[in-house]
């Protein structure tokens, strides 16, 4: 994560870190006071063993004070003065403060204590023998602690003779060495950084000393001292209640580990000749593979067990408290972004940023943790080979690609290469922008297409709903209309007429095919239809009286119908208000007919006026047998119904069927056609005598006293035989028809009764 200035992400949490340091300031001061008292106590013990050195130690105890330290820090603040004739301690303090100015007042006391301790070391080394020092450096630290605990007098004698180890607390040093192994991930980074900075500072101070030939301070002692300081700094952060996980403390990185290996590893393998050759008493570090082990167990015996003190990070600059982790990130991410696109504004080169704030005098331009530049500058008088090895170790770090976005800009990159990289980055930015735009456009097009399809689908769904509702309404109307529909349904018969007569069921197909010819040839008929009756309603074809349709309803029970017929006397005059009288002409136009027995074959033209004999009543009984002339002309069909053909010109039509090819124009009949009801009517003779009354289902049949003709029927071309009195034989047709539509001889001749 980068902040707005392109700095390291740890700078974002800078206030929290200083707050934790501010909370730890009081504890640091208390520990420093305690350590100073402990130092004084140990120095008193050493004065008893080393009487000649007591006065020197007394002077050393008075040297570094807080005001003097603050005055000397303004002398050299931003650089490491390696060669100068100014105050030695002022340079040491100012260098330490320049590296740790980000830690505010809490690091001032720690730096003061560190300077005091180093001054004690410097003065002690002037009176020590380097051979014993080398022997002590080769001993393990644990063995050294055991020797100090078990053989303190003998160790003190050896210290008096050559090497003077200050032993303020062996248990504390052991705790430090042990804890460095357990908490290496949290402390080794700051340990190495502080070790390097203070080592370089003390080396610079030692090189300025006039007695540099006799001065030979062991670098491992300084490293151990700073390790204790840094460990207690981390421990103080824990004690203040601030969690280390939330703070931006430096972490252990590969660069930090390598630097620790370089420094401490070479200190273990240092020789007397190298120590003599180097003015500061140590040589250029070399790479060793075990850094953590060196920190934990490999610290030489000559390391002074310094007092426990809350430490400070000497390698931090003003800009950030974690520049070392930033530099290690840069080392591992060398040249990461050469072929990538970086659109962020935080493309600041971190190495140059660090060099501007911390390593202003650096030659090789490495990061903060690459403190071998300082060591190379200190040992610049030693030889070009050592300096070359240092440069090879620091500036020629191989690139490690482990992810991330911030690259390390190479220091030796030419302006042309930088310009090419900038152009390449701009091209990548433009290409990425075009790619994003294409994706956005494609997404928008697909979205619009989807919206159109959704709208179309919605409209289709609405249309389907409308059509479904319409279909349901039509089905409902059809279902409700079917119960009251007057048209014939598909399961009913189709009736065909021929010359106004109804054809039998056997010729329905022929009649339907010849219905057109029937309507053209039948000029004398009153047929107003096209020859086919397609309905159940009797009023469809009732315009002509000679074309009454066939009632297709099933025949009701005649016996039950006859029981409801009212028995009325038929001898008297017919009431003008009767239903039968309404069908004929008025009484003034009616003519009387003579009895049928006197004129069986009288032509209609001979009937002019009623005769006197016609006044008598007609008591002609109905015989049980039909006349011989009617038998062949009106045969009885198998279903109990008969078809009567009127033949008045001698052309007998004996065929039981009628079709359109056998039509003959109708003429006025001169006889009354009578058909005895068979099958549907059960005639019972009361007696077989002539003139006996005939009964139909127990009802006597009587003829009227005077038979009358229907004058209107005669004028219309009919037979004029419309009955005006007398009981008619009830049938299914007469029970359902309107009184104006009673049977006529042309329509249903079989339903007439002889008068």
UniProtKB/Swiss-Prot annotation:
Span of domain bZIP: 418-481
**What are the Phosphoserine sites (modified residues) in this protein?**
548
**Which InterPro entries does the record cross-reference, listed alphabetically?**
AP-1 (IPR000837), bZIP (IPR004827), bZIP_sf (IPR046347)
Query: What is reported when this gene is inactivated?
Result: Loss of isoform A causes embryonic lethality.
What are the subcellular locations of this protein? Nucleus
SUPFAM superfamilies membership: Leucine zipper domain
One biological process term from GO is:
positive regulation of border follicle cell migration
A GO MF term: RNA polymerase II cis-regulatory region sequence-specific DNA binding
Q: What segment(s) does the record annotate as region Basic motif?
A: 420-439
Query: What residue spans carry the region label Disordered?
Result: 23-75, 149-168, 316-350, 383-440, 510-552, 716-755
More info: Mammals typically have four copies of fos, Drosophila has a single gene with multiple transcription start sites giving rise to multiple protein isoforms.
What binding partners and quaternary form does the record give? Homodimer. Heterodimer with Jra. The kay-Jra heterodimer binds more stably to the AP-1 site than either of the two proteins alone.
Q: Which family does it belong to?
A: Belongs to the bZIP family. Fos subfamily.
Q: What is this protein called?
A: Transcription factor kayak, isoforms A/B/F
Q: Which species? A: Drosophila melanogaster
